[in-house]
Amino acid sequence: MPRVKRGVTARARHKKIIKLAKGYRGRRNNVYRIAKQAVMRAGQYAYRDRRNKKRVFRALWITRINAAVRQHDMTYSVFINGLKKASIELDRKVLADMAVFDKAAFAAIVQQVKAAVAA
C-alpha cells in the first residue's frame, strides 16, 4: 500500500480557512493559524448576533410604535392592551412600518384602539 502524504489535504484545508478570512486586516487574512482563530471567532459572533438581531429589531419596532402612539396621547402599553381588546391582530413589525410610512392608516388603528379602551 502506498504511503499517503498529507500535503494535498492540508493545502485544501488551509485554502478553505484563508478564503473564509478574506477581507480581514493584518495577518488575519494570510497566516493560517491566526486566520483560523479569526474565522472561528467570527463564526461565534455571527451565531450570537443572529439571535440578538431578533431582540434588537423587536426593540426598534416597540420604540417606533411608542413614539407614534404618544403623538396620539396614548402610551405603548395601553395601545397594545387596546389592540388585544379590539382583536386587531397586527404584529409589531407591521405596526412600526405603518407608523413610519402610512401615518393615516396608523391613526385609524389608534382611533379603533381608543374606542376599544373606552368601552
UniProtKB/Swiss-Prot annotation:
Similarity comment: Belongs to the bacterial ribosomal protein bL20 family.
GO biological process, one term: ribosomal large subunit assembly
Membrane-crossing segments per the record: none
Keywords: Ribonucleoprotein, Ribosomal protein, RNA-binding, rRNA-binding
Name listed for the protein in its UniProt record: Large ribosomal subunit protein bL20
rRNA-binding in keyword set: yes
PROSITE patterns in the cross-refs: RIBOSOMAL_L20 (PS00937)
A GO CC annotation given for this chain: ribosome
Highest taxon of the lineage: Bacteria
Role of this protein: Binds directly to 23S ribosomal RNA and is necessary for the in vitro assembly process of the 50S ribosomal subunit. It is not involved in the protein synthesizing functions of that subunit.
CDD domains with a match to the protein in the record: Ribosomal_L20
UniProt GO MF annotations: rRNA binding; structural constituent of ribosome
